[in-house]
C-alpha cells in the first residue's frame, strides 16, 4: 500500500502527524488495515459503498457513497468529512489519493462525478491543505475509463490544479 508505506517512511524520518485522504472509489482497506489503529495517522476514505472491497476495513473515517452519487451530493459529503478530519486531527502532512474512478466515465466506479465535479473535489482538498498550512503529497489513483484519455484528462486536471495551488501558496511564503 503506497500511502501507508509513504506515511510510515515519513514518520521514520520525522514524527509527523499524517492524514491520508483517499478519494479513490474503492475503500482504502489496505491503508485502514495498516494505519487504522495508529494515533499519529488519520485515514479518510470516501468510496462506493457497494464497490470492491465488499468487506470493508475499519478506518478513522469511512464514508460509503451510493451508486450514482453525483457532484452536489459528493462535494457536500466531502466538505463535511474534511471538517470532521480537522475537528478530530491536526495533520502536519496530507497524502491525497486522487482517484480518477469517481468520474462518470469510469467503467468500474459506479459514481457520477463530472469533470467539473472532479475539479471541485480537488480544489476542496487543496484548499483544506492550504487553510491548515499543511504540505500535501498527491498520488494519482484508480481510473478505469471507457476511454483511456478520460482517465488521463482527470489526472492531468488534478496536476494542473495543484500547480496553480502551489504557485498561490508559494506567494504566501509556503509551498504545498
State each model region's role:
Residues 164, 168-176:
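Single conserved hydrophobic/aromatic residue that forms the stacking wall/gate
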Residues 1-167:
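A general "terminal functional-core" signal
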